[in-house]
Amino acid sequence: MADSDADTTDAPSLRTPIVAVLGHVDHGKTSLLDKIRGSAVSEGEAGAITQHIGSTAVPLEVISTIAGDLVDPTDFDLPGLLFIDTPGHHSFSTLRSRGGALADIAILVVDVNDGFQPQTEEAVDILQRTETPFVVAANKIDTVPGWNPEPDRPSKLAIESQTDRVQSDVTERLYEIIGELSSADFSADMYWRVQDFANNVGVVPVSAETGEGVPDLLTVLMGLSQRYMRDEMAIDV
């Protein structure tokens, strides 16, 4: 019977994917994590968010609330996401390298005003060497001149609501980052244009300050983990 085939009691138990956050100093790694934490705390029940030094566990139900219509919790059997911060200073490159290697997936935070910087390139090298899947959080879109804040809104919609001039400016900055990824031998595009995340890097425009793109970022991370790393998340119970 179809019902027995769909019985979820035989589904494997899955662990929480570990998400490393990397990027150049002052590009907004910690601010982005703080925004995710803040959104999670405000949307979750007391005690739902587990925080340790340098790490934050955000359960699926909280991610679903933050992401809104972008995430249907019934589509996922992962328990949530565990974010780990990695030190931004050059002297911590060894520790950051270890953090990258320990992660299942990573967020590479890049300031849309600065593009790739030395520690960005170092982070990309770490991700290449450890073969860690990653997405790019193109941060600080709220600092583009003329940007009209759309707090906590999906970034594609937030960008489309801006004036033509601002849209053009944002798009130009994003494609400069995509070009830099191409120079590092990564095929990349705006996340909503990527059909094959196994072979292409998704770029998610975000604002750690006003929250645009945070729903998208969480959605992409959950989707990548569920679709491409589900077997790696399976645990014996």
Short names for language-model regions:
Residues 2-86:
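Conserved G1/Walker A P-loop phosphate-binding module
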Residues 2-9, 40-47, 60-71, 92-94, ...:
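Active-site phosphate-binding and catalytic loops of NTP-dependent enzymes
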Residues 141-196:
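GTPase G-domain guanine-specificity segment
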Residues 15-26, 30, 172, 186-237:
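Conserved catalytic-core segments of large NTP-driven translation/proteostasis enzymes
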Residues 16, 53, 79, 102-105, ...:
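Short glycine-/polar-rich loops that comprise or flank the Walker A/P-loop
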Residues 93-114, 128-135:
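Inter-motif core of Ras-like GTPase G domains
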Residues 25-26, 32, 49, 85, ...:
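Residue-level signature of catalytic and energy-coupling elements of molecular machines
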Residues 39, 63, 88-90, 112-116, ...:
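Conserved nucleotide-binding/hydrolysis micro-motifs of P-loop NTPases
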